[in-house]
């Protein structure tokens, strides 16, 4: 009679064992990482499998570890576009300018290879994975919903940097400062060296000229698309100035027998070329008066500026103004700019390390203001009443109070500062530091597809007249000119 009880107990024990086994098997299945859902960061699925699972990991580029990993957080598509301490890592449509691609790539036939290879101290990505990332970037690096970063707001505040070593214009977000797009400029395979960039007075367009080119090019600021170009013949087109109504431009050819090209910016047609061989010598900087009737052009290799009456811009008259009657070193006037009210104009004199100030009505010298070594470009803040002057050899920006006509501070900004631009909305000044091999400046973080040595951006806080602490953003090769679109 005991046998049935024993069998019943065995049956019960067996059922319990099966239940435990099923529970254990179920737990193992739940622990399988291949089955676990994960936060894809709103990357496309195939991209998320690579970036989220292999890059945005503990000890590397996730939110918790980013400070020890160059400040780069790859946890989400949005945080990726904040970049790292050196700037943007992903530039939509440009894997050839994206360090995210450089540092995962191990095959030079696919593009740039940089060290150390990422993921750090782990097996490198397969070629298929590298191609997935490269092709995704070249398609605009869209998110999980197909959206392209920075394409949502045609009125976005931005600033532009012309990188003359690569024929690239960097389009920077005014909030994060990162490069949103790289625009190839020029119309020839050879490097044409974009030397100056300017946003139109109404903020609708930007223009660029070249020291080894034959055009001025026009682009829309809403989407940075090419609009048109005006043929102005081959020359060393260094600088240009735009009338206050945005309809006309004068472009200067820096050559021994220099020229000025007068262009209608609405039709993008060359209307006239001003020249006087043997007399109009090495012109460089230029500025048009607020009323649009007087054009000033500096003659960089001497003591002269040229004053043109362009009331009739097709048949102008000009005169020569001597700006240094004190003897000694030549003034070598580089650039010229009007005060906000138009009553004065300022001339950087690189040969004498000073800014000279003149009365617009009489062209009489008002003041000679000492600067740091080799003053070049200028940008004015009407709100602060400051004139900011890059001094390339002095590695500084000299700040001049335009109400008292005195220098108030020299700010060390970086190696070989050249272009700069005031951003009134942000109370900042953007400074492009060329950082060429002869400068003694810091080695760049990386080398891009065009080779050469990258420059970098620093920022002055206009409230404190100090650099923004810890900010140094890598640019492309030989950044030369900056312009703001507010």
Listing of model-derived features with the role each one plays in the protein:
Residues 19-21, 26, 131, 311, ...:
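N-terminal non-cleavable signal-anchor helices
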Residues 119-121, 141-486:
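Predominantly soluble domains enriched in secretory-pathway, periplasmic, or organellar proteins
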Residues 11-12, 29, 111, 283, ...:
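Hydrophobic alpha-helical segments, principally membrane-spanning helices and signal/leader peptides
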Residues 1-4, 8, 88, 219, ...:
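A detector of low-complexity, intrinsically disordered, Ser/Thr/Gly/Pro/Ala-rich segments
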């Amino acid at each position: 009679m005991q046998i049935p009880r024993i069998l019943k107990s065995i049956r019960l024990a067996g059922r319990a064992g099966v239940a435990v086994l099923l529970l254990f098997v179920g737990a193992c299945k739940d622990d399988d990482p291949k089955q676990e859902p994960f936060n894809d960061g709103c990357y496309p699925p195939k991209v998320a499998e690579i970036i989220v699972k292999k890059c945005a990991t503990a000890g590397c580029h996730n939110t918790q570890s980013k400070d020890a990993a160059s400040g780069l957080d790859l946890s989400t598509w949005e945080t990726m576009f904040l970049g790292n301490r050196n700037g943007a890592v992903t530039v939509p449509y440009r894997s050839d300018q994206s360090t995210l691609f450089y540092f995962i790539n191990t095959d030079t036939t696919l593009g740039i290879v940089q060290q150390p290879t990422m993921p750090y101290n782990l097996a490198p990505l397969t070629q298929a994975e590298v191609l997935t990332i490269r092709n995704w970037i070249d398609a605009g690096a869209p998110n999980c919903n197909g959206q392209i970063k920075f394409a949502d707001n045609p009125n976005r505040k931005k600033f532009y940097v012309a990188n003359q070593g690569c024929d690239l214009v960097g389009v920077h977000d005014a909030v994060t400062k990162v490069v949103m797009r790289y625009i190839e400029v020029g119309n020839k395979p050879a490097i044409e060296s974009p030397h100056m960039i300017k946003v139109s007075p109404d903020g609708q367009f930007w223009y660029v000229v070249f020291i080894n080119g034959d055009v001025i090019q026009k682009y829309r600021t809403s989407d940075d698309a090419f609009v048109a170009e005006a043929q102005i013949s081959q020359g060393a087109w260094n600088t240009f100035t735009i009338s206050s109504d945005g309809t006309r431009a004068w472009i200067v050819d820096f050559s021994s027998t220099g020229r000025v090209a007068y262009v209608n910016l609405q039709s993008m047609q060359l209307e006239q070329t001003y020249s006087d061989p043997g007399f109009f010598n090495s012109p460089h900087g230029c500025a048009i008066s607020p009323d649009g009737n007087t054009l000033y052009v500096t003659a960089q290799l001497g003591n002269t500026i040229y004053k043109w009456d362009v009331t009739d811009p097709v048949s102008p008259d000009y005169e020569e103004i001597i700006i240094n009657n004190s003897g000694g070193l030549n003034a070598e006037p580089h650039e010229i700019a009007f005060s906000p009210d138009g009553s004065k104009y300022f001339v950087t004199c690189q040969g004498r390390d000073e800014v000279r100030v003149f009365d617009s009505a009489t062209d009489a010298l008002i003041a000679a203001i000492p600067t740091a070594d080799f003053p070049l470009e200028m940008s004015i803040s009407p709100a602060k009443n400051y004139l900011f002057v890059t001094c390339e050899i002095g590695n500084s920006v000299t700040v001049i109070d335009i109400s008292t006509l005195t220098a108030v501070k020299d700010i060390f900004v970086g190696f070989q500062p050249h272009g700069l631009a005031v951003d009134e909305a942000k109370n900042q000044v953007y400074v492009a530091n060329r950082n060429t091999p002869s400068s003694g400046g810091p080695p760049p973080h990386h080398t891009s597809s065009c080779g050469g040595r990258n420059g970098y951006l620093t920022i002055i806080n206009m409230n404190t007249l100090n650099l923004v602490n810890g900010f140094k953003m890598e640019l492309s090769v030989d950044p030369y000119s900056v312009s703001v679109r507010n």
